[in-house]
């Protein structure tokens, strides 16, 4: 069921993922390219109540949708435990758009972020 959030993540269209991921960002020295690694531990998308194939991760906010198809499952003792998704940006405008989503997602979920120095 879809919650009424400003920003959300979906693996199945119309179904919000309630598990909040750990997100790690890396950028090139000139800042024009980089990636965001999303790590979900025991996400609902891997539970027995979900049906269908995961074909990507949708990041949805008031501006629209950002889609990545780079999604993989990690198994522990034969059980799907982790879901990892990678969003790659290749321009500063893509990065700026991603950061607007990330800030909106953080506010929707009561989160903050920290930077490594």
Swiss-Prot record:
InterPro entries named among the record's database cross-references: Psb28_c1_sf, PSII_Psb28_class-1
Pfam families documented for this protein: Psb28
Keywords: Membrane, Photosynthesis, Photosystem II, Thylakoid
Its membrane topology: Peripheral membrane protein
Highest taxon, organism lineage: Bacteria
Subunit composition and interactions: Part of the photosystem II complex.
HAMAP family recorded: PSII_Psb28 (MF_01370)
Protein known as: Photosystem II reaction center Psb28 protein
Organism: Prochlorococcus marinus (strain MIT 9312)
